Amino acid sequence: MHQPYSTVTPYITKDGSEIRELMHPSLHENRNQSLAEATIPVGTKTLLHKHMETEELYHVTRGVGRMTLGGNILEIVAGDTICIKPETPHCLENTGSEPLVILCCCSPAYSHEDTLLAR
């Protein structure tokens, strides 16, 4: 399978970030995971949320920010990788001067139905 980046249309997901689904079972022939690029604009943050089934791996490819991960606050920079276990509340804040860009690998694949916003 091959997915040219130029053909991926971004959308806004439930947490407020701009997402490009680079590989997802609903669009491609892969089965058990998804890979997306998330962009958080300067001065913004995503909504606190959790996934009941999905484990996520985030890899920061550009920018700097702050991540809430359960009860921890992490300062993140390009090159950092974070594991988010199921049922762990999390959100991202862009604290830098350029977009915060993250590769997100989800297993099982991301679904809106598995995303619960914090109250």
Model region roles, listed by residue range:
Residues 53-55, 60-65:
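Glycine- and acidic-residue-biased ligand/ion/polar-headgroup-sensing regions
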Residues 45-47, 66, 82, 86-92:
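Histidine-centered metal-chelating micro-motifs
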